[in-house]
Curated annotation (Swiss-Prot):
<keyword id="KW-0256">Endoplasmic reticulum</keyword>
<dbReference type="GO" id="GO:0046923">
    <property type="term" value="F:ER retention sequence binding"/>
</dbReference>
<keyword id="KW-0472">Membrane</keyword>
<dbReference type="GO" id="GO:0005783">
    <property type="term" value="C:endoplasmic reticulum"/>
</dbReference>
<feature type="topological domain" description="Lumenal">
    <location>
        <begin position="1"/>
        <end position="2"/>
    </location>
</feature>
<feature type="transmembrane region" description="Helical">
    <location>
        <begin position="3"/>
        <end position="21"/>
    </location>
</feature>
<feature type="topological domain" description="Lumenal">
    <location>
        <begin position="111"/>
        <end position="117"/>
    </location>
</feature>
<feature type="topological domain" description="Cytoplasmic">
    <location>
        <begin position="200"/>
        <end position="213"/>
    </location>
</feature>
<feature type="topological domain" description="Lumenal">
    <location>
        <begin position="169"/>
        <end position="178"/>
    </location>
</feature>
<comment type="similarity">
    <text>Belongs to the ERD2 family.</text>
</comment>
<dbReference type="GO" id="GO:0016192">
    <property type="term" value="P:vesicle-mediated transport"/>
</dbReference>
<protein>
    <recommendedName>
        <fullName>ER lumen protein-retaining receptor erd-2.1</fullName>
    </recommendedName>
</protein>
<feature type="transmembrane region" description="Helical">
    <location>
        <begin position="62"/>
        <end position="80"/>
    </location>
</feature>
<feature type="transmembrane region" description="Helical">
    <location>
        <begin position="179"/>
        <end position="199"/>
    </location>
</feature>
<keyword id="KW-0931">ER-Golgi transport</keyword>
<dbReference type="Pfam" id="PF00810">
    <property type="entry name" value="ER_lumen_recept"/>
</dbReference>
<comment type="function">
    <text>Required for the retention of luminal endoplasmic reticulum proteins. Determines the specificity of the luminal ER protein retention system. Also required for normal vesicular traffic through the Golgi.</text>
</comment>
Length: 213
């Protein structure tokens, strides 16, 4: 495992921990899209179906368990424990418009037409667009708490670092996975406008994050 992948995994873990701490400490999930969190949970479930059948390393298994537990923990906090604080009115993105096309694409374009491989491919496609309900919610409300902006920035950084990981692996191992690379680029592009606003408004101006009108 190279430095880019490890740093990406750290950024991803930080994003998840920041989100969980934000919800738990504030006793509120205001500003967080429950629909995006459901999609992320679905991503991890379909990606890690091999958890109990294939063992690659302790690190790999530990990270799989962490992602599964954390994602379901987030869903529980949002949809059960603190559901009274969940802003359903602004979290209205139709997630079936993401799930169904991702599944169709996974059935059509995959490495091998077997169940585990199709599910893995589905998770890659779905993860690329799973943040859209959150960004849609952010565009509707017009602003977000600084801690929520930090969460989104860490999440976007994780995917960007994975792109660097793939570039590194291409030049050092001649490894190239077009499905992962294209999906990763799409996911990073979705964050582009958010990154710009985050850097100019939250980092440089130290203000609450606000979307442009």
């Amino acid at each position: 495992m190279n430095l880019f992948r490890f740093t990406a995994d750290v950024a991803h873990a930080i994003a998840i921990v920041v989100l969980l701490l934000k919800i738990w400490k504030s006793r509120s999930c205001e500003g967080i899209s429950g629909r995006s969190q459901l999609l992320f949970a679905l991503v991890f479930v379909t990606r890690y179906l091999d958890l109990f059948t294939n063992f690659f390393s302790f690190y790999n298994t530990a990270m799989k368990i962490f992602y599964l537990v954390a994602s379901f923990g987030t869903v529980y906090l949002m949809w059960a424990k603190f559901k009274a604080t969940y802003d359903r009115n602004n979290d209205s993105f139709r997630i079936e418009f993401l799930v169904i096309p991702s599944m169709i694409l996974a059935l059509l374009i995959n490495h091998e037409f077997i169940f585990m491989e199709v599910m893995w491919t589905f998770s890659i496609y779905l993860e690329a667009v799973a943040i859209m309900p959150q960004l849609f919610m952010l565009s509707r409300t017009g602003n977000a708490e600084t801690i929520t902006a930090h969460y989104l920035f860490a999440l976007g950084s994780y995917r960007f670092l994975y792109i660097l990981n793939w570039v590194y692996r291409y030049y050092t191992e001649s490894f190239f996975d077009p499905i992962s690379v294209v999906a990763g680029i799409v996911q990073t592009v979705l964050y582009a406008d958010f990154f710009y606003l985050y850097i100019t408004r939250v980092i440089q101006s130290n203000r609450q994050f606000e979307m442009s009108a």
